[in-house]
From Swiss-Prot:
It comes from Shewanella pealeana (strain ATCC 700345 / ANG-SQ1). It comes from the Bacteria. The keyword Amino-acid biosynthesis applies. Pathway: Amino-acid biosynthesis; L-methionine biosynthesis via de novo pathway; O-succinyl-L-homoserine from L-homoserine: step 1/1. It catalyses: L-homoserine + succinyl-CoA = O-succinyl-L-homoserine + CoA. One of its GO terms (biological process) is L-methionine biosynthetic process from homoserine via O-succinyl-L-homoserine and cystathionine. The keyword Endoplasmic reticulum does not apply. This is Homoserine O-succinyltransferase. It is found in: Cytoplasm. Transmembrane segments: none annotated. The lineage of its organism: Bacteria, Pseudomonadati, Pseudomonadota, Gammaproteobacteria, Alteromonadales.
Length: 314
């Protein structure tokens, strides 16, 4: 949250140069406060587990957040009861006319399936397009980040021979973005995917900014320059055992997955995983919610005219 200070206080310029969030008394006096309305499109198979992971991150901020859960309307969930889906999830038609402060679209376990071959690809495209007019800021995670970069910017991913799974070291490529406030010079994040975006193409795109990257795992956080879309190539929401559960699931299915890198103590799957990404995962979501949702969204959600308009690749 911002520190409120008197107008024209000399310290303001110094604090802002150090990336400390300050707000003048005048601005604070004119700022209305209400709950943030966040929509979650949950594409992961275990809906309840993913809900819990994301709500844990959203709840770790001083903001009140009202959450709606969204599902793909014509796709039944194999791992979550129909009662749960009907009781807690909405179809797109139920929210199409609404506006939201934030939207989170999760990853999806689609392996090496091409985007155009995904059975619900047209619906994903429809929701992404809708979000650019009805949502202040969108957070895309893992598969959703790749899908949105492809749909919005025409940037396709490259498939990997071996799944990139593990916990990798990352570094900031800039220190001047509010999203990175509080980030260490080196931090860790989990990845679990069969594809990768070309980091040089991301860097070269005039509408994108690569904020953090990994020598082993490539681009991690990419922001559209209108601040409306944040693409995160990994899984900051993952809990300590998630990569282990995925590894054991693949083995149970008769696959031969590689051991997740930098994850198990002594690279021994019988030992406890090492958790070292939760603080930065929490900080990422907190910074996004504060600086790119709360600080940018209109008080009256019925009027989105003040939000920077989206310009498509066409």
């Amino acid at each position: 949250m911002p520190v409120k200070i008197p107008d024209d206080l000399p310290a303001a310029e110094i604090l802002e140069s150090e990336n400390i969030f300050v707000m003048s008394e005048t601005r604070a006096a004119n700022q209305d406060i209400r709950p943030m309305k966040v929509l979650i499109l949950n594409l992961m198979p275990n809906k309840i587990e993913t809900e819990t992971q994301l709500l844990r991150l959203l709840g770790n901020t001083p903001l009140q957040v009202d959450v709606d859960l969204l599902r793909i309307h014509d796709k039944a969930s194999k791992h979550t009861s129909i009662d749960h889906m009907n009781n807690f999830y909405r179809d797109f038609e139920q929210i199409r006319q609404k506006n939201y402060d934030g939207l989170i679209i999760t990853g999806a376990p689609l392996g090496k399936i091409e985007f155009d071959e995904v059975s619900y690809w047209d619906h994903i495209r429809e929701i992404i397009d809708w979000s650019q007019q009805h949502v202040t800021s969108v957070l895309f995670l893992c598969w959703a980040a790749h899908a949105a970069l492809y749909h919005l910017f025409g940037l396709n991913r490259s498939l990997l021979e071996i799944k990139r799974a593990g916990v990798f070291s990352h570094k900031r490529t800039s220190v001047h973005y509010p999203l990175l406030r509080g980030f260490d010079d080196e931090f860790f994040a989990p990845h679990s995917r069969f594809a990768e975006m070309d980091i040089e193409k991301l860097r070269a795109h005039p509408e994108l900014e690569v904020l953090t990257e990994s020598d082993e795992a490539g681009a991690y956080m990419v922001l559209s320059k209108n601040n409306r879309n944040l693409f995160v190539m990994g899984h900051p929401e993952y809990q300590k055992s998630t990569l282990k559960d995925e590894y054991n699931r693949d083995i149970a299915q008769g696959l031969t997955p590689e051991l997740p890198k930098n994850y198990f103590k002594n690279d021994d799957p019988d030992q406890e995983p090492i958790s070292r990404w939760h603080s930065h995962g929490s900080l990422l979501v907190s910074n996004w919610l504060n600086y790119y949702v709360y600080q940018l969204t209109p008080y009256n959600l019925d009027d989105m005219t003040g939000i920077t308009p989206w310009e498509s690749k066409d």
